Swiss-Prot record:
Keywords: Ribonucleoprotein, Ribosomal protein, RNA-binding, rRNA-binding. GO terms for cellular component: cytosolic small ribosomal subunit. HAMAP family: Ribosomal_bS18. This is Small ribosomal subunit protein bS18. Disulfide bonds: none annotated. Binds as a heterodimer with protein bS6 to the central domain of the 16S rRNA, where it helps stabilize the platform of the 30S subunit. Part of the 30S ribosomal subunit. Forms a tight heterodimer with protein bS6. PROSITE patterns: RIBOSOMAL_S18.
Amino acid sequence: MSRKRPQPPVKPFKKKPNPLKAAKVTEIDYKDVALLRKFISDRGKIRSRRITGVTVQEQRELSKAIKNAREMALLPYATSGR
């Protein structure tokens, strides 16, 4: 007969503000390197939605734009930690 411990009340998480809506960005373009750099880590990796606070559709557009900018040599590929 094991009893379950009472769980502490779950705090509702606060949703992050969308940085694209705050900057009034309507179209994500691969040539807008200054905007794309905000969504890349210092090692060159694309940051997740959980960290950036963008929607699913915007994350897809961002990742496509970042990958396109990398192909055009506007952004660096992910670097190693060495």
